Amino acid sequence: MTTLYVDADACPVRAEAERVATRHRLRMAVVSNGGLRPSQNPLVETVIVPDGPDVADQWIAERAGRGDVVITADIPLAAKCVEAGARVLRHNGEAFTPANIGQQLAMRDLMADLRAANPLGAGGGGKPFSKADRARFLDALEREIRAAQRDAQG
């Protein structure tokens, strides 16, 4: 059965994911190291993991596989889940796939190196999360859930 895993730290689409999971009657695991208000939805499990680097990511990576969908912005976690056969989405609806995950990891590493080489440079962060990002995410989540359900059957 398909499970929707949400890497919940700084996830702007948790509520949207819950609505979609409920509509599809999917189990949803919202994984964090704390600070989340548990959902009253019986399909949603709030998983609180111990503090520590990448503990939530490890929890998800150990469980996600073929027929599941993972929502995360964490590229190393996405790589592990893609390798395990799960379908993986960013919060803006962009899919991590076997075809693009290597490039995503390389770009992440390059950007980390550039930031480390220029400690005085302006970081700035990413662009704000928009209504278009939210709509793109919802469309992509619907598509990936249907595909994951097919994966789980075959």
Swiss-Prot record:
InterPro entries per record: UPF0178 (IPR003791)
Domain of life: Bacteria
HAMAP family: UPF0178 (MF_00489)
Family: Belongs to the UPF0178 family.
NCBIfam families named in the record: PRK00124.1 (NF001095)
Protein name: UPF0178 protein SPO3827
Organism: Ruegeria pomeroyi (strain ATCC 700808 / DSM 15171 / DSS-3) (Silicibacter pomeroyi)
Upper classification of the organism: Bacteria, Pseudomonadati, Pseudomonadota, Alphaproteobacteria, Rhodobacterales
